């Protein structure tokens, strides 16, 4: 009996340790966010016509004395083009996406968007023209319908069905509750591949002229990925697509 009295508190403490570590990690991340400079609130600018993205001699480093992640990069992502960006981890692929979204600004050089009507420097005001699918699982706690409506609050059930079909996510309609199926934070209850396809469907629902996919198909098998990219090309025929992969 004495042994059990000693063991029980120790076991309880051992169970609490992972929770404590996770909590501390979360606190550290929140503290990092607090240190970030506040972004100025700007009115969105909607560009008319097909959009191209052009970088001229762009370099970027995450610190003043650090190695340049992107070094004198020049490229023109022409309107309506489909571009695959390949490279190993740390090669600067995600950094390029962040530059397009103006989450960071070039250390050197310039980035700009252009249409047949003119050219404008990349800025936070242009983000409404883009649809972005980041790495990892980006679903939120709630129903599949709730997650899809984040892409377009006015989407109908038919719109969602079409987007899910394009994203190779017809499996949703085989689930007992269909669109009203609940998923936990980060798509809990779904496989990673299923969660990725729902995230892609959400991006498809968002009207955009530029689609950015940052390793958004990493959990899919090759055949499913091929079919998905084929569907995306057909659906976004007039949009500029930038696809980041390994």
Regions found by a protein language model. Give the residues of each.
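Conserved E/DxxT/N motif and adjacent residues on the DHp alpha2 helix
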Residues: 32, 39, 149
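Pre-NBD coupling/linker segments of ABC/ABC-like ATPases
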Residues: 38-48
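Cytosolic ends of transmembrane helices, especially the final helix of ABC transmembrane type-1 domains
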Residues: 5-33
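ABC-type nucleotide-binding domain
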Residues: 49-246
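Phosphate/oxyanion-binding loops and surfaces in catalytic or ligand/nucleic-acid-binding neighborhoods
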Residues: 33-37, 167-170
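Short, hydrophobic secondary-structure boundary micro-motifs
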Residues: 14, 41-43, 173, 183
């Amino acid at each position: 009996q004495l042994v059990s009295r000693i063991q029980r508190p120790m076991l309880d403490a051992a169970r609490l340790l992972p929770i404590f570590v996770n909590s501390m990690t979360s606190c550290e991340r929140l503290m990092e966010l607090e240190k970030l400079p506040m972004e100025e609130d700007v009115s969105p600018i909607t560009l008319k016509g097909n959009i191209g993205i052009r970088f001229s001699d762009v370099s970027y480093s995450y610190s003043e004395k650090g190695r340049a992640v992107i070094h004198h990069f020049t490229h023109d992502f022409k309107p309506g083009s489909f571009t695959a960006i390949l490279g190993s981890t740390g090669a600067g692929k995600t950094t390029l996406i962040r530059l397009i979204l103006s989450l960071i600004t070039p250390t050197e050089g310039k980035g700009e968007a252009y249409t047949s009507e003119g050219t404008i420097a990349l800025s936070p005001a242009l983000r409404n023209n883009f649809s972005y699918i980041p790495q990892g699982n980006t679903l939120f706690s709630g129903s599949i319908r709730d997650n899809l409506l984040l892409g377009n609050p006015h989407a109908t059930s038919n719109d969602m069905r079409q987007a899910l079909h394009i994203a190779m996510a017809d499996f949703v309609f085989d689930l007992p509750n269909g669109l009203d199926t609940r998923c936990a934070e980060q798509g809990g209850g779904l496989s990673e591949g299923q969660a990725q396809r729902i995230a892609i469907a959400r991006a498809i629902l968002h009207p955009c002229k530029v689609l950015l996919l940052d390793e958004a198909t990493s959990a899919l098998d090759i055949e499913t990925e091929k079919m998905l990219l084929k569907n995306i090309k057909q659906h976004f025929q007039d949009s500029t697509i930038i696809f980041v992969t390994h």
